[in-house]
């Protein structure tokens, strides 16, 4: 009820302004009695994946809390895990505004944010300040001005810094809003990146005395052959998981709507079936050797169950969470428990 009132007010505003306002209020109330406005008591429905046990299978996708400012607040809502980021080695402003657009009739969003974040050192301070036992994944990326050929170095810098504080690390090579980034999903660049990250993980596990799993986040705009090659590379490098999928450059299901022609990645309801298809194809190629976190267009509990049926072990929500509110977390966990 409270969310519907807040949403009505927020949806009158520019999407990015509304987002910043929400993050600000969650940041200030996460550990106060005021979190009663959004806190939920969700009965555990544990999932073991990547050697970790999550309290339930519903996570918050990266991009909502880029700088890890509201981890305790999202934990209070009942998320089984919270993926913060995407974070880069150095702070960067992202692309020019406006860069985020609602497509309300389609329950969709188009964004071209461009990895705006306050940098990895700032994120680390926020991770150190977390007061709850939230499971936090950290999504890492490269700075816009780092050449793609040297992109690997940015991922290694971020991995080194967040490793002691992350439950897992997600490697984002699939945002459509950083020029050239998606080229890291192919061939030698991919093999080199995965191999280097895996080597770094071994060194860091020894140094810190703990193993932090690494997952690769992929795009939905891939051919069957490309998905197969990525799966082979993941198996070969012994990565711990895949996250499928990021936003899409396609505009299926939104053509003719206000803002549909804006550049950027489309998320929300229209992405649901495409991302589920990619999960199914990826699962078929991985043959159970790596688990999958399914994300993209989940707007109701049934959408989440479809992704689990397609081969995902857990799910994440973002746009559906904006349109439906915290109740969506509870709905999915309840449906999962019944299933």
Curated annotation (Swiss-Prot):
InterPro entries referenced in this protein's UniProt entry, alphabetically: Aldolase_TIM, DHO_dehydrogenase, Dihydroorotate_DH_1_2, Dihydroorotate_DH_2, Dihydroorotate_DH_cat, Dihydroorotate_DH_CS
Gene Ontology terms, MF aspect: dihydroorotate dehydrogenase (quinone) activity
Pfam families the UniProt entry points to: DHO_dh
Domain of life: Bacteria
Membrane topology: Peripheral membrane protein
Compartments where found: Cell membrane
Substrates-to-products reaction catalysed: (S)-dihydroorotate + a quinone = orotate + a quinol
EC supergroup of this enzyme: oxidoreductase
Pathway: Pyrimidine metabolism; UMP biosynthesis via de novo pathway; orotate from (S)-dihydroorotate (quinone route): step 1/1
Binding site for FMN: 62-66, 86, 139, 172, 217, 245, 268, 297, 318-319
Residues at which substrate binds: 66, 111-115, 172, 177, 246-247
One annotated Gene Ontology cellular component of this protein: cytoplasm
Cofactor: binding details: Binds 1 FMN per subunit.
Keywords: Cell membrane, Flavoprotein, FMN, Membrane, Oxidoreductase, Pyrimidine biosynthesis
Cofactor requirements of the protein: FMN
Active-site residues (renumbered): 175 (nucleophile)
EC numbers, comma separated: 1.3.5.2
Gene Ontology biological-process annotations: 'de novo' pyrimidine nucleobase biosynthetic process; 'de novo' UMP biosynthetic process
Subunit-level organization: Monomer.
Chain's role: Catalyzes the conversion of dihydroorotate to orotate with quinone as electron acceptor.
UniProt family annotation: Belongs to the dihydroorotate dehydrogenase family. Type 2 subfamily.
Protein name: Dihydroorotate dehydrogenase (quinone)
């Amino acid at each position: 009820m409270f969310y519907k009132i807040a949403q009505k007010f927020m949806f009158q505003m520019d999407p990015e302004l509304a987002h910043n306002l929400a993050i600000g209020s969650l940041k200030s109330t996460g550990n106060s009695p005021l979190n009663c406005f959004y806190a939920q008591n969700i009965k555990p429905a544990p999932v073991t994946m990547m050697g970790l046990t999550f309290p339930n299978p519903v996570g918050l996708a990266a991009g909502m809390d880029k700088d890890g400012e509201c981890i305790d607040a999202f934990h209070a809502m009942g998320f089984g895990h919270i993926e913060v980021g995407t974070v880069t080695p150095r702070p960067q402003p992202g692309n020019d505004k406006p860069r985020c657009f609602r497509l309300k009739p389609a329950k969709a969003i188009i964004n071209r944010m461009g990895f705006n974040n306050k940098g990895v050192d700032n994120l680390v301070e926020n991770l150190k300040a977390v007061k709850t036992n939230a499971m936090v994944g950290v999504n890492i990326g490269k700075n816009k001005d780092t050449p793609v050929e040297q992109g690997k170095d940015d991922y290694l810098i971020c991995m080194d810094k967040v490793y002691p504080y992350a439950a897992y690390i997600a490697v984002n090579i699939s945002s459509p809003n950083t020029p050239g980034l998606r080229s890291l999903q192919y061939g030698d660049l991919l093999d080199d990146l995965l191999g280097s990250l895996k080597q770094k993980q071994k060194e860091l596990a020894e140094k810190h005395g703990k193993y932090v799993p690494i997952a690769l986040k992929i795009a939905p705009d891939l051919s069957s052959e490309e998905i197969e090659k990525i799966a082979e590379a993941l198996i070969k490098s012994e990565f711990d998981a895949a996250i499928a999928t990021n936003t899409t450059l396609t505009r299926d299901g939104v053509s003719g709507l206000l803002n549909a022609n804006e550049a950027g990645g489309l998320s929300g309801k229209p992405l649901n079936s495409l991302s589920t298809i990619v999960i199914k194809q990826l699962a078929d190629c991985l043959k159970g050797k790596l688990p999958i976190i399914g994300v993209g267009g989940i707007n109701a509990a049934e959408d989440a169950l479809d992704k689990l049926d397609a081969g995902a072990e857990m799910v994440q929500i973002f746009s559906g969470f904006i349109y439906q509110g915290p109740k969506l977390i509870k709905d999915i966990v309840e449906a999962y428990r019944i299933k």
